[in-house]
């Protein structure tokens, strides 16, 4: 049985690229859904269980930090990985302090590095 991933990002190109990054059928992971912001992600999670959330930080309506806080307030134990183009140390620290399990820079993403982060 594969682990279910929810991708939260407001950029359609990122969602398409994420799907095409690797042959997901050859991994223990399935991209089961996407959301365009934190609020959409919370609505998705009300109806669909997932094992891992990968989220961007900067989004309208509810950003990634807001999503992390909302999940932690609901005592969620779903691991959250931040996938962002921002390398600012303060943003990284804020995400990890809020409860993110990991932080990946979009510029550094490859199929191998993503799978390595997911395997942690």
Where in this protein do the model-derived segments appear?
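Structural signature of beta-strand start/N-cap positions in the alpha/beta core
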Residues: 4, 31, 49-51, 79
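Conserved acidic segment of CheY-like receiver
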Residues: 3-14, 18-19, 53
